[in-house]
């Protein structure tokens, strides 16, 4: 199987060759994103791998289908950038990466802590050797009421973890 990968970041490159060898597939790597100017590079391949900023709209998918592409994977959790109806119509299977909802929840809470404790302001001041407290005193999590829109896999993990901080969940 031959796969062309678009939008490959430097930190991804080191994983692609070992995985390709293990799976006995050929992978061609491009840092450029999939678009109307680069889609012709997919000619002669069996599958395409993209990232979130690559748009796989109806026009792109029609061209890929014409090249015989049977599979499209996105190296992201989200897949809004892919026209699923068109992919289905053109017989292109679509896949995305799995994820750990706990990992995403951890990052969400990291951002909440950074905001409530005014971490960016503290960091900026520390660069100037200013360690005064004026204007950087944050809020304590146990005093906060947090509204969560959507209690799916990630939202449920965030709610569970915030209870450990003593937050009121709405």
Q: Can you annotate each of these PLM segments?
A:
Residues 1-45:
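N-terminal glycine-/charge-rich "phosphate-binding" loop or analogous flexible N-terminal tail
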Residues 8-11, 31-35, 52-56, 76-79, ...:
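Short beta->alpha connector loops
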Residues 26-30, 95, 170:
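General small-molecule cofactor/ligand-binding pocket signal
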Residues 28-34, 52-53, 125-134:
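Short gly/ser/thr-rich secondary-structure transition/capping motifs
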Residues 41-43, 66, 141:
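A short, aliphatic-rich alpha-helical micro-motif
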Residues 45-123:
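Phosphate/diphosphate ligand-binding glycine-rich loop within oxidoreductases
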Residues 136-170:
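Rossmann-like dinucleotide/phosphate-binding beta-alpha-beta segment
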